[in-house]
Amino acid sequence: MQRFTGLVTATTLATYLLVVLGVATELTGGVSPAAVAHYVTAGAVWLLLVAAAALAWRDSRLPRVKWGVTAAAVAYPAQAAVGMAVLASGGPGQLHLFGGVGVFALLLITLTWHLDREVEPRERAAATAFNREGDGDDSVLLYRLPDGLRRYVELTKPRLMWLLCLLALSGMALATVTGAALDGVTIAATLFGGVLAVGAAGTFNHVYERDRDRRMNRTADRPVATDAVGVGRATAFGVGLLVVSMAVLVWLVNPLAAALTAVAVVYYAVVYTVVLKPTTTWNTVIGGGAGALPAVIGWAAVAGSIGLPALLLAAVVFCWTPAHFYNLAIAYRDDYARGDYPMLPVVAGVAATRRRILYWLGATLLVAGALGAVAGFGPVYALTSAVVGFGFLWTVVVQFRTESDRDAYRSFHASNAYLGALLVAILVETMVI
């Protein structure tokens, strides 16, 4: 059964790689490295599909898994024939592309069915919630700071900053496709203003959630929860960060970037923290818009407008957020229950949450492929998304096998690695190649 799991997982990701390489082939035209890789991958996917279908009928106990893999194996040569017809006629390849996306989606759904119903758990004893002490915002470097300074730095949630800054930087790099030029002042001011805004939003979150934080092991040592920093001082600190952020962005960047940054702060500090997080299981999904906005902010800082590639990059992050955060929610579900937060694993259970992780990961990969098509990215972006995406997907597959909360935490880190690598690939495609 483990062999079948690995085979279907590999086939699913190979199909995704085939799709993004197909997009790159369409963009480059002719006999390019992307085209050669696409044709080689197409043959490999066909062999994997045949093997997966044969193994499904031999080993799988669930009829819909058998028929799902079989349907993909039947649909694949049909969409390949469409691709050959497009190649011969020189016509548009949208139907071929949609066929490939359909096969990928079918395989992902089939993999989810298989994992949910047929994979035997190996570590049920490890299914108790994984509780680490502390908030997760601290580090060895942070603890070297004087106590007073360290507490205020903790308020800003510094571990959120690197990925959000990388996202904004990728948005700025994407904007160069419009012909806009990057300059050092714009880059530095956008990132500095963004860091201050992230710090302000994090501080407001600490202030509002202080009572619930005291109930949770993970957050009980936060500065406001422990009264190490008073509510009034923390609020004033957050307001000060926001004011300086707005001044920097308006003065050194442009009003649109400043306005979008203000929207992001309100989205996180009010819409997510106050309205969504304590009231609905959809808090993570809808709240993902706050983390997606830096992509648009970065583009606006350079181009002075909002463009489709920036919106697609934001959509990648929006879809990635549930696939990312649900892993943490699984690992700390007992803690969230103590804090009276209706996180999905608390309300719907771990199995349902893992299914959602797979579906949102699939959506992330597809939107990332659409971004590559619109922005005209090549094999570097395609291979990065597929290879690191495979690593992310495999950690989720392992969760189904072990039901270990430590593996959920590993998936959380793998999701960070996926987005970070994807953003670096965007920088390489736009600034180097």
Swiss-Prot record:
What InterPro entries does its record include?
Protohaem_IX_farnesylTrfase, UbiA_prenyltransferase, UbiA_sf
Q: In which pathway does it act?
A: Porphyrin-containing compound metabolism; heme O biosynthesis; heme O from protoheme: step 1/1
The primary location reported for this protein is: membrane
Q: What class of enzyme is it?
A: transferase
Highest taxon, organism lineage: Archaea
A single GO molecular function term of this UniProt record: protoheme IX farnesyltransferase activity
- Region annotated Protoheme IX prenyltransferase sits at 165-430
Q: What Pfam family is a match for this entry?
A: UbiA
* GO BP annotations listed: heme O biosynthetic process
Membrane topology, record value: Multi-pass membrane protein
Cellular component per GO, a single term: plasma membrane
Q: Give UniProt keywords alphabetically.
A: Cell membrane, Heme biosynthesis, Membrane, Transferase, Transmembrane, Transmembrane helix
User: For this protein, what reaction is catalysed?
Assistant: heme b + (2E,6E)-farnesyl diphosphate + H2O = Fe(II)-heme o + diphosphate
Annotated transmembrane regions: 4-24, 35-55, 67-87, 95-115, 160-180, 184-204, 236-256, 257-277, 282-304, 308-330, 357-377, 378-398, 413-433
User: What's this protein's family per the entry?
Assistant: In the C-terminal section; belongs to the UbiA prenyltransferase family. Protoheme IX farnesyltransferase subfamily.
Further remark: Carbon 2 of the heme B porphyrin ring is defined according to the Fischer nomenclature.
List the protein's name.
Protoheme IX farnesyltransferase 2
UniProt source species: Natronomonas pharaonis (strain ATCC 35678 / DSM 2160 / CIP 103997 / JCM 8858 / NBRC 14720 / NCIMB 2260 / Gabara)
